[in-house]
Amino acid sequence: MAGMRLILVGPPGAGKGTQAPNIQKKYGIAHLATGDMLRSQVARQTELGKEAKKIMDQGGLVSDDIVTGMIKDEILNNPECKNGFILDGFPRTVVQAEKLTALLDELKLDLNTVLELQVDDELLVRRITGRLVHPGSGRSYHLEFNPPKVPMKDDVTGEPLIQRSDDNADALRKRLVTYHEQTTPVVEFYKKKGKWAAVDAAQKPEQVWEQIVAILEKAE
């Protein structure tokens, strides 16, 4: 089982946040999300973290080399990575994919697969714009898929529910256009390498999970 290394790709609302912990638990591997890695390096004041903080403080985007450096640091020093890892949020461009390939070659590691969670854009819009949250507890509901017993009221306290402002349809559609523009070339890059697998993420989470396990069993 040693060595399950995969990349998880999917648009906002596709369920990466649900499935990544499942994969992490089943295979005993590390979940490397770029945002978390950045925050951790900045908090620990590592050389990479200091460099990244300087750029972010100026409102810039952290370079691909810094992110690749952080991934290398995790692979070499994070004990959870000894069985493998899930990369989440990277690579987002073909240049990043090439840098990651070079890094894995340097470390003599293979990538098992790239899992793409696929969902129709309009279903994503319905999923995300229907989300309701109870601010006090963080309990979440959905207008269509998991409605509260009383409209717009929390089941437990009866307090009002809110919709998050960044969950509005226009903003989300823009994010999805950007996502597809960025991701399509990356997916093509891995398809050519024979490292890509599609998952129908429009299904219920349990069914998505079954499909993921079936793909990973083959990819071992």
Curated annotation (Swiss-Prot):
Keywords: ATP-binding, Cytoplasm, Kinase, Mitochondrion, Nucleotide-binding, Nucleus, Transferase
Source species of the chain: Schizosaccharomyces pombe (strain 972 / ATCC 24843)
Region: LID, residue numbers: 130-167
Name listed for the protein in its UniProt record: Adenylate kinase
Function: Catalyzes the reversible transfer of the terminal phosphate group between ATP and AMP. Plays an important role in cellular energy homeostasis and in adenine nucleotide metabolism. Adenylate kinase activity is critical for regulation of the phosphate utilization and the AMP de novo biosynthesis pathways.
Catalytic activity of the protein: AMP + ATP = 2 ADP
Primary enzyme class: transferase
EC number(s) from the headed UniProt entry: 2.7.4.3
Domain notes: Consists of three domains, a large central CORE domain and two small peripheral domains, NMPbind and LID, which undergo movements during catalysis. The LID domain closes over the site of phosphoryl transfer upon ATP binding. Assembling and dissambling the active center during each catalytic cycle provides an effective means to prevent ATP hydrolysis.
Compartmental location: Cytoplasm, Cytosol; Mitochondrion intermembrane space; Nucleus
CDD domains: ADK (cd01428)
Family membership: Belongs to the adenylate kinase family. AK2 subfamily.
Biological process per Gene Ontology, one example term: ATP metabolic process
GO molecular function, one term: adenylate kinase activity
Bridged cysteine pairs (disulfide): none
Gene3D superfamilies assigned: P-loop containing nucleotide triphosphate hydrolases (3.40.50.300)
Entry binding sites for AMP: 34, 39, 60-62, 89-92, 96, 164, 175
Region (NMP): 33-62
Complexes and interactors: Monomer.
Name of the gene this protein is made from: adk1
GO cellular component, one term: nucleus
Residues annotated for ATP binding in this entry: 13-18, 131, 140-141, 203
InterPro entries referenced in this protein's UniProt entry, alphabetically: Adenyl_kin_sub, Adenylat/UMP-CMP_kin, Adenylat_kinase_CS, Adenylate_kinase_lid-dom, AK2, P-loop_NTPase
